[in-house]
Regions:
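Active-site anion-handling motifs in enzyme catalytic cores
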Residues: 1-337
Length: 337
């Protein structure tokens, strides 16, 4: 990592760059709540913070001595365009931090029809770095996604009864799931508490989304992914073993037999939270060394906090509206007996 010489502190900004879905795109809750901004607001609110989407960085806001926190979500090697964005951030700012972002390498015939990025990332110029991929060939330090700090994960298994042998979490970005005949499912666009309760009420989780698998491991569940997911290597570097199902039709007995071949994850939630708290301490030390707390720019900070809160709640509001519409249509469609 880059070695920073001691310099005079200035009133700078902290920039948070993570993935926010574009207008009319299906929401991916995991990317929305993966930024560490949401979990350390007591500290970050002392400074002027600016939130950016990875596809729409406000470049004019970023200055040389500011702080940039990149992540989480699968932002590394996901595309050449994203690698260019990160390298440009590194060139523009001396204090760029990668926090819990994930790497990607695609096979030739992957279901996403994507190519592996060939633009190298200048990791050696980062101030701090931690990636969500465990024992990745790059040798980058392991740091689970910051979404593990979400308070929803404090829900106890004892408070949620088991309702099903196998639950399924589908990616809202996909029109079809790789396995047909599912008896039960939710998508990764649901509110986080809904997803947590669904995971806890299932014995085993079949899932196509990275964060759905990660959250299930946090909650101590055995995880199975469709084998089609092996087209991108981000599914190969979970902290604890997962299994891959190579059939295209749901077979509960086969899935349960497959689940029996993998160990139950230990207390991954505590481990993940501890690693994020340790990394936060490093980030806090860097910030306190480099920039002063904000006084004059408090209005900008308040506005950016409100934007962050809206990011957190809009997807939940939209999903509740859809549910209510479904219930209304169901009631209107019933004929009098």
């Amino acid at each position: 990592m880059q070695n920073h010489a001691t310099s005079m502190k200035r009133v700078g900004k902290i920039h948070f760059v993570h993935h926010l879905e574009k207008l009319y795109a299906a929401p991916n809750l995991g990317d929305w709540i993966a930024s560490p901004y949401y979990y350390f607001t007591d500290f970050f609110s002392r400074y002027t913070c600016v939130l950016h989407s990875d596809w729409s960085v406000l470049w004019h806001e970023i200055e040389r001595d500011d702080i940039v926190i990149f992540g989480g979500g699968g932002l590394l090697d996901n595309s050449d365009a994203l690698n260019v964005v990160l390298n440009r951030l590194i060139d523009k700012c001396d204090n760029v931090i990668v926090w819990g972002a994930g790497t990607h390498k695609y096979t030739d015939n992957n279901i996403f029809n994507k190519k592996t990025a060939i633009t190298p990332i200048n990791y050696e110029k980062l101030a701090l770095c931690g990636v969500r991929d465990y024992q990745h060939p790059t040798g980058l330090p392991f740091l689970p996604c910051a979404s593990s700090l979400n308070p929803a994960f404090l829900t106890k298994q004892a408070d949620v009864p088991i309702k099903r042998k196998i639950g399924t979490i589908k990616s809202a970005l996909e029109s079809t799931f790789a396995v047909s005949g599912l008896p039960s499912s939710v998508t990764n666009a649901e509110p986080i508490q809904v997803i947590v309760d669904y995971i806890l009420s299932s014995e085993v989780i079949l899932v196509s989304s990275y964060h759905g698998a990660f959250w299930s491991l946090l909650l101590g569940k055995k995880v199975i992914l469709p084998a089609t997911r092996l087209g991108v290597d981000k599914y190969k570097y979970f902290r604890y073993p997962v299994a891959f199902y190579d059939k295209d039709k749901y077979d509960e007995q086969e899935l349960l037999a497959l689940a029996a071949t993998i160990p139950s994850p230990p207390d991954f939630l505590s481990e993940s939270r501890m690693l994020n708290l340790e990394f936060f301490n490093k980030v806090r030390n860097l910030i306190e060394e480099r920039i002063e707390k904000s006084v004059e720019n408090s209005t900008v900070q308040i506005l950016s906090k409100r934007v962050a809160q809206m990011e957190f709640t809009l997807v939940e509001m939209w999903n509740y509206v859809k549910k209510m519409n479904g219930r209304i249509e169901g009631v209107e469609g019933k004929k009098p007996q």
